[in-house]
Structure formats: C-alpha cells, structure tokens
C-alpha cells in the first residue's frame, strides 16, 4: 500500500483541495509527472492541463489548471495554480473562449516572442479541450 502525503491545490480565488493523498499526476512543463510520498524535492512549472488526485480513501478527483508552479517535498506537494477548477465545474465553452481570445490577440501581435507565446498557448488550450471533452 502506498504511503500518504499532504497535497494542496491553491488558486488565487480559493483553496480547492487540502488533504492526504496517495498520488497526484501533474502536467509539468517537462512532461506529465506523478508525485508520491517521499518524492525528491522539486520545484516545477505547470502548463495548462488536468491534475489527477488519488485520495487516501481511493477516490479520484480531476482538476483543470491553467498554469502555475508545484513545490514538491518528500512530505507533501503544493500546487499554486494561476487558475483552477474541478473538471465537473468547468464550463464547456470556457476553453473555447480562451482559445478565441488568444487567436484575436495573435492577429494584432507584433513582436515575434509574443506571437510565439500565443501560438503555444493556443496549442496547449486546444489539447486541453480535447482531453476534457473525452471525459
């Protein structure tokens, strides 16, 4: 049986979750990452994606995050999200609205670096929309 550790998911609006869990799968910018008890200390950035949490009771919860940072220690993990909502609370058109707003901004962007970031954001949001719509 896997050891438990404390996990907190925090957005600027609220504390979404603070409980003992057995594992958390996070969309790190380097790739999907599974965090378990006694994980090596790590700090990583989070890209838009789905965070899957397996609680100590065995219940699985999924949250959509729109970027942030994760601070991982052997005894716990704190994910500070730019924005986050439980998957079941996500309005289906929210991702489409974000994609369309980024596309409109891209049309008027002048700097290459800004265009590149917007294109990357659109790609991530489009992928996330596909993942969320499958569930």
UniProtKB/Swiss-Prot annotation:
Q: How does it sit in the membrane?
A: Peripheral membrane protein
Source taxon at top rank: Bacteria
Query: Keywords, A to Z?
Result: ATP synthesis, Cell inner membrane, Cell membrane, CF(1), Hydrogen ion transport, Ion transport, Membrane, Transport
Query: What InterPro entries does this protein's entry cite?
Result: ATP_synth_F1_dsu/esu, ATP_synth_F1_dsu/esu_N, ATPsynth_dsu/esu_N
Membrane-crossing ranges are: none
Q: How does it assemble?
A: F-type ATPases have 2 components, CF(1) - the catalytic core - and CF(0) - the membrane proton channel. CF(1) has five subunits: alpha(3), beta(3), gamma(1), delta(1), epsilon(1). CF(0) has three main subunits: a, b and c.
Q: Which PANTHER family match?
A: ATP SYNTHASE DELTA/EPSILON CHAIN (PTHR13822), ATP SYNTHASE EPSILON CHAIN, CHLOROPLASTIC (PTHR13822:SF10)
Return the similarity comment. Belongs to the ATPase epsilon chain family.
Its biological purpose: Produces ATP from ADP in the presence of a proton gradient across the membrane.
The protein's name in its UniProt record: ATP synthase epsilon chain
Organism whose genome encodes this protein: Rhizobium johnstonii (strain DSM 114642 / LMG 32736 / 3841) (Rhizobium leguminosarum bv. viciae)
